[in-house]
Curated annotation (Swiss-Prot):
Cofactor note: Binds 1 zinc ion per subunit.
InterPro entries: DNA_glyclase/AP_lyase_DNA-bd (IPR015886), DNA_glyclase_Znf_dom_DNA_BS (IPR015887), Formamido-pyr_DNA_Glyclase (IPR020629), FPG_cat (IPR012319), MutM-like_N-ter (IPR035937), Ribosomal_uS13-like_H2TH (IPR010979), Znf_DNA_glyclase/AP_lyase (IPR000214), Znf_FPG/IleRS (IPR010663)
Membrane spanning residue stretches: none
Protein name, per record: Formamidopyrimidine-DNA glycosylase
GO molecular function (one): damaged DNA binding
UniProt KW DNA-binding keyword: yes
Cofactor: Zn(2+)
Sites where the protein binds DNA: 106, 125, 167
UniProt lineage: Bacteria, Pseudomonadati, Pseudomonadota, Alphaproteobacteria, Hyphomicrobiales
Length: 296
């Protein structure tokens, strides 16, 4: 599933085609994605201008001059393709490996823009969705009402200590809880925990002192999360088995993975003689170095 860096890469690539443009025609080629489209979805978009394109966690939000916001989630395999008036094509945030990319039969939403560009949403697995929400109620809508803090918006050890205090859940599980920190996924949590030298099964509450102040480990983790995400965004995300940019290029951060999907390979930390191992937590693979990420 596309994580925060991949969705941010999509946003940056898609913004030039959407922001300031008007929906001239919207064609739905099926009645639903993961969920049914909102009532009169195409009609509520047509004639409206996109005034801004933002990201909240793993969601894209396009503000419209109608007072509504188009909320979009890519699911497991969603992607956007942009056909420009000059005949060239872009695929903003194309993180899927060749062979896993969508085909025209999975083009479910086609949006003709006033600029002459055509933006197509393709989703082979149909786990993505689109919704329309009153802009004034966006923060309180069902998608975002219980969502946690943005990790790239001032995340500190003090914030982590406040969120994790008294929690007995494993550290990795707490980091994946979107009600605490929104937008983190399996890949970047594994990478951040390795950089912070923290075991994924350590109790989340251990990052807060009895008085609620952050431990050194909480400060290290906050720094690692921000570094990993910023580096991944700069690299254009990670190209995965199921995920592909808007310009058709691949994300490159997978080449910087230190633990993810590297079972049996030597730990990349200078001076560490350990190897990367894998365990399963909540039906998800966890990759870490048992030598420099010891338990307890």
């Amino acid at each position: 599933m596309p994580e925060l860096p991949e969705v941010e890469t999509v946003r940056r690539g898609l913004a030039p085609a959407l922001v300031g443009a008007r929906f001239s025609r919207v064609t739905l080629r099926r009645a639903n994605l993961r969920f049914p489209f909102p009532e009169r979805f195409a009609a509520r978009l047509e004639g409206r201008t996109v005034t801004g394109l933002a990201r909240r966690a793993k969601y894209l939000t396009a503000a419209l001059d109608s007072g509504e916001t188009l909320v979009m989630h890519l699911g497991m395999s969603g992607r956007f393709d942009v056909a420009l008036p000059d005949g060239s094509n872009l695929s903003p945030g194309d993180f899927y490996l060749e062979g896993a990319q969508g085909t025209p039969k999975h083009d479910h939403v086609v949006m003709a823009m006033s600029t002459g560009a055509t933006v197509t949403y393709n989703d082979a697995r149909r786990f993505g969705f689109m919704d329309l929400v009153p802009s004034a109620e966006l923060a309180a809508c069902r998608h975002f009402a219980r969502m946690g803090v943005e990790p790239l918006d001032g995340l500190t050890g003090a914030v982590i200590a406040r969120l994790f205090r008294h929690k007995i859940a494993p550290l990795k599980a707490a980091l994946l809880d979107q009600r605490l920190i929104a937008g983190l996924g399996n890949i970047y949590v594994c990478e951040a925990l390795h950089r912070a030298r923290l075991h994924p099964e350590a109790p989340a509450g251990s990052l807060a002192r009895p008085d609620g102040r952050p431990t050194p480990e909480a400060n290290a983790l906050a720094k690692a999360i921000v570094q990993v995400l910023e580096e991944a965004v700069k690299a254009g995300g990670s190209t995965l088995r199921d995920y592909a940019h808007t310009d058709g290029s691949a994300g490159a951060f997978q080449h910087a993975f230190r633990v993810y999907d590297r079972v049996g390979l030597p730990c990349s930390r200078p001076g560490c003689a350990g190897a990367i191992t894998r365990i399963v937590q909540a039906n998800r693979s966890t990759f870490f170095c048992a030598t420099c990420q010891p338990p307890g």
